[in-house]
Structure formats: C-alpha cells, structure tokens
C-alpha cells in the first residue's frame, strides 16, 4: 500500500472512530467488523477487490452482499468506501478501524503462540503480565499452537512482543557461544 492509499485508509478509519467513539456498542461494532474481515479472508473476496479485471460495479455488488451489519455506521462506512471508488482498500480500512478503536480504548487483542494450550489460570497470569508490562488492557486472548517453539510462549499485543520461547532462548545461547 502506497502513501496515498495509506492516507485514504487512515482518513476513513479516523472518521469512523470519531463518529462511534461515544457509543456504548463500540465493542459490538468491533466484533462485527472482525466478522466482516473473516468473511473477506474466508471467501477470498479481497482477490476480487484487488483485481484490475473486475469492474468497479461488480466489486460494489460483491461488497454489498457481505455488508449485512446491524449497525448503520458500519454499513455507511462500507458504502462510503465503495462510492468513492476505493473498494480495493476495504479490507485495510476495516483492519485500520479495528486498530483505531483499540487505540482509542487502549484495549487490544493478544495473540499467544505456545506448544500446548494454556489453562484459564495461565491466561489470567499472562493477561496481568501483559497489562502491566505494556500499560494497556487485554480485551481477548487468541491462542495458536506451534510445536516448533519447543516450549514457552510468544505473546504479541499491539505490535509489541514478549518472546519467552525455548527456541529463541536456544538461539540466544548459540549466538553467545
């Protein structure tokens, strides 16, 4: 994405968050935006939106079929993106809206990669650690399993990382030797 497109995406996202920042339903909107992002990824809709061979009208029709949000603000955002001819930036816009809501509320999703699933007690300890270390609130913890870590975990929150994996520790030891 070039600087011009980045500015367009940022404009849409900031405008949307300014409109909805006082709503009590902001996290419900966040969840519906997450659902839309999942639909776009699962259906490979972004390939169509980025394609130069698909007409602007066809792109608009495809997007309108998935734009069934119960919040008029989300539907208006999507309609604005389509109307302005930026359907190819829809996915990036929705992702940026999520990021801006999280920044506004200082509440973020945490992604944890570990060898084994975490217990609820471990998740709570991890939530507390992340909230203290990064001075933010953790809204949700998403787990991913990866056997190549050998042990430990990697936590990613708002582009910040805590890497306590055995694999990384072994690499550090190897560098020192």
From Swiss-Prot:
Keyword presence, ATP-binding: no
InterPro entries the record matches: ATP_synth_OSCP/delta_N_sf, ATPase_OSCP/dsu
Sorted UniProt keywords: ATP synthesis, Cell membrane, CF(1), Hydrogen ion transport, Ion transport, Membrane, Transport
Pfam families in the record: OSCP
Presence of keyword Ion transport: yes
UniProt GO MF annotations: proton-transporting ATP synthase activity, rotational mechanism
Gene Ontology cellular-component terms listed: plasma membrane; proton-transporting ATP synthase complex
Membrane topology of this protein: Peripheral membrane protein
Compartmental location: Cell membrane
Subunit and interaction comment: F-type ATPases have 2 components, F(1) - the catalytic core - and F(0) - the membrane proton channel. F(1) has five subunits: alpha(3), beta(3), gamma(1), delta(1), epsilon(1). F(0) has three main subunits: a(1), b(2) and c(10-14). The alpha and beta chains form an alternating ring which encloses part of the gamma chain. F(1) is attached to F(0) by a central stalk formed by the gamma and epsilon chains, while a peripheral stalk is formed by the delta and b chains.
PANTHER family named in the record: ATP SYNTHASE DELTA CHAIN (PTHR11910)
Function: F(1)F(0) ATP synthase produces ATP from ADP in the presence of a proton or sodium gradient. F-type ATPases consist of two structural domains, F(1) containing the extramembraneous catalytic core and F(0) containing the membrane proton channel, linked together by a central stalk and a peripheral stalk. During catalysis, ATP synthesis in the catalytic domain of F(1) is coupled via a rotary mechanism of the central stalk subunits to proton translocation. This protein is part of the stalk that links CF(0) to CF(1). It either transmits conformational changes from CF(0) to CF(1) or is implicated in proton conduction.
Homology family: Belongs to the ATPase delta chain family.
Listed name of the protein: ATP synthase subunit delta
Gene giving rise to this polypeptide: atpH
């Amino acid at each position: 994405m070039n600087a011009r497109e980045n500015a367009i995406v940022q404009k849409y996202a900031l405008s949307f968050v300014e409109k909805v920042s006082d709503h009590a339903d902001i996290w419900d909107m966040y969840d519906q935006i997450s659902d839309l992002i999942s639909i776009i990824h699962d259906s490979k809709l972004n390939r169509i939106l980025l394609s130069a061979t698909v007409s602007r009208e066809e792109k608009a029709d495809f997007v309108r079929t998935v734009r069934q949000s119960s919040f008029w603000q989300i539907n208006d955002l999507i309609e604005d993106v389509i109307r302005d001819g930026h359907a190819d930036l829809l996915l990036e816009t929705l992702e940026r809206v999520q990021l801006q809501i999280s920044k506004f509320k200082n509440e973020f999703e945490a992604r944890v990669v570990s060898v084994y699933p975490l217990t609820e007690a471990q998740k709570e300890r991890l939530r507390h650690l992340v909230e203290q270390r990064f001075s933010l609130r953790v809204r949700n913890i998403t787990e991913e399993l990866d056997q190549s870590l050998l042990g430990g975990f990697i936590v990613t929150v708002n582009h910040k990382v805590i890497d306590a994996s055995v694999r990384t520790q072994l690499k550090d030891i190897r560098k020192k030797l």
